[in-house]
Amino acid sequence: MILSDADILRRLEQGDLVVEPLDDPDIQIQPASVDLRLGHEFLEFQHANIPCIHPNSEDEVSDYVEETVIEEGGEFILHPGDFVLGTTHERVAIPDDLIAHVEGRSSLGRLAIVVHATAGLCDPGYEGQITLELSNLGTAPVALTPGMRISQLTFTELKTPADRPYGAERGSKYQGQSGPQASKIQGDREFGGDQ
């Protein structure tokens, strides 16, 4: 079951679902979603002259990105074909009986802005800011302003709560993240990690 605005408000008031700061609930809470705003931090992928990135090499992954912080009132220009990691302004905490889906806003989609490449899911138990995988599929640069509504979060109720939710017990590598996070895929078992 997808939560309606009334369901979302009830869960927020109960405190088991967290979206904060929720500065303007009348605007941000939609009929079946919550609009999330763009944060100030971005990780830009460098145009590197390297043959490839090896996902199991933390150094190669971290050397490939550079952090940019946009000051209040500033803009981040997303050029055609570019891919950057951004973050939501809000921090979320998803209870064990819900799953959250990150979706783009249709108004930005009509400007060819995509807010997630593949990671559109927040597992039960996830806590932290949400990293956005932003790309411009259009032919013109688009100015993104921190604080603008950039995405929406919908919530689906699970039939039963997760037995092993995302979090410390599972060693979840993105739990509690603040700001955009580069890939930590080198922590996966197939690359010698423990996850």
Swiss-Prot record:
Active site, per annotation: 133
Catalytic activity: dCTP + H2O + H(+) = dUTP + NH4(+)
Composition bias type Polar residues, residue spans: 174-184
Gene3D superfamilies: 2.70.40.10
SUPFAM superfamilies to which the protein is assigned, alphabetical: dUTPase-like (SSF51283)
Residues noted as binding dCTP in the record, renumbered to the chain: 105-110, 123, 131-133, 152, 166, 173, 177
GO molecular function terms noted in the UniProt entry: dCTP deaminase activity; nucleotide binding
Superkingdom of the source species: Archaea
Region (Disordered): 159-195
InterPro entries linked: dCTP_deaminase (IPR011962), dUTPase-like_sf (IPR036157), dUTPase_trimeric (IPR033704)
Function: Catalyzes the deamination of dCTP to dUTP.
Subunit structure: Homotrimer.
Family statement: Belongs to the dCTP deaminase family.
Protein name, entry field: dCTP deaminase
Species for this entry: Haloarcula marismortui (strain ATCC 43049 / DSM 3752 / JCM 8966 / VKM B-1809) (Halobacterium marismortui)
Taxonomic placement: Archaea, Methanobacteriati, Methanobacteriota, Stenosarchaea group, Halobacteria
Gene name tied to this protein: dcd
